Every structure is written in structure tokens, then in C-alpha cells.
Amino acid sequence: MTKEQALQYTKYAAKKALDELEKQRSVRFTLKDEIPSVFESKIGGVPYFPSDAEIPVDSNGNPLRFLMQIKCSDIQGLDCFPKQGMLQFWICADDCWGMCDKKGFRVIYYDAISDSTITPQMPAFNDMEKEFFPLKGEYGVAFLPTVEDAPKNLSLIHI
């Protein structure tokens, strides 16, 4: 093998290795038609709510709105994701969905799912909240593990 061929092969092997490093495991989800129970992954509706829990509030004391929950055992193939419990997302029902400040949303993780739950007394939406909230309804969620390209915002080498 000539020096030029060795250099070309090295570039090829390095690019192939970098391409593999730039792949990341991820999970896609789709909506299901059936309405899930409070113990299942879902978007909207009534969340899993342990009897000792409180509805999260924003910096003004206004209740946040339930967006989504993930039953962690439904997620397969992500080593860094919890294997059990429930992960919930709560947001403000404003035009920014609570993303304008760090107190307008909450992510809550329950490490165990208990049968001792209550139905939270969620206050009714006012007209503005109805207009801005991104959900209308309740949906089950199915998860599919996949591999996608990692973000290209960091260049490790130039070949």
C-alpha cells in the first residue's frame, strides 16, 4: 500500500468512526386512540397523582397545567433513562407555555408508582388559558426506540 493509499484509508476509517459516534439513541412517540388510565403514559387528561403530592405552581402561586407523563418502563433502549417510575411535565397555560422564565414549568419524577392515588382538583381553565393551552383532549402514547444523527453543532475533526 502506498503512502497515499494509506492516507486515504485512514481518512475513510476516521470518517466512518466519527459517523458512528455522531449517532444517538432516541425515542419517538405516537398517539394512541384509547384513553389511558392514570398509571399509563399519556398526553393531557388526568395525571397520576400520589395522595401526598401537590399540584405544582408558578412563581405567582398559580397552578401549572398537566401536559404529559411517561411511565418510565415504557421507554426501552435509553441507558440514561430511569427504568421505573413516572416522569411528568407541567406548564403554564399562557402564550409562552411557561417557557419565558424557569418558574413557569415543572418536570416531576416519581421513582415508584403507588396504587394510593387521588384525583387532583384541577381548577377550570379560564378563557385565556383555553385559547393558549396546546392540548385539547387526552391521548395514550406509544414509544418506539430509534437511532438518529446527533446534532452537528460540534466539529471534532476536519477530514
Annotated model-derived regions:
Residues 1-157:
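Preference for intrinsically disordered or flexible, low-complexity segments
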